[in-house]
Amino acid sequence: MVKLMKKNTDDGAKIYTPLTLKLYDWWVLGVSNRLAWGCPTKEHLLPHFLEHLGNNHLDIGVGTGFYLTHVPESSLISLMDLNEASLNAAATRAGESKIKHKISHDVFDPYPAALHGQFDSISMFYLLHCLPGNI
């Protein structure tokens, strides 16, 4: 028997309110990455992000925009998230002048055809745990 997953991605996105986003960096990037995963943000994840960053970048599941604050001024950044609070927080933090697109989009829906081939790098940190179903 094939069991179909009922998708409700809103449940995973709605936890990211302006209040929880204020605590996000401390908890996720500080405590969780270092202590739970043994992968400190500044020592491992940020250098990995910057090493693979292109000039025209798409960030999917933007969180607070922490990683985007470290991109060169010449970079063009597009943001994709289902949560408007996250999109706004990341755009503000990264700097609106760097933001090419803010895309409110459910990752379970087809990727917008108008965006095909526009990016030379894509990142997707911390998204899988927000998706419905079992991993």
Regions found by a protein language model. Give the residues of each.
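Hydrophobic adenine-recognition pocket in adenosine-nucleotide-binding enzymes
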Residues: 127
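A short, conserved alpha-helix within the catalytic core of class I
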Residues: 131-135
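Local beta-strand N-terminus motif with an aromatic residue
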Residues: 54, 119-120
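Class I SAM-dependent methyltransferase SAM/SAH-binding core
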Residues: 58-111
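Short amphipathic alpha-helix with an adjacent loop that forms part of the alpha/beta core around
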Residues: 111-117
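Conserved class I S-adenosyl-L-methionine
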Residues: 2-53, 66
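A conserved beta-strand element that flanks and buttresses the S-adenosyl-L-methionine
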Residues: 123
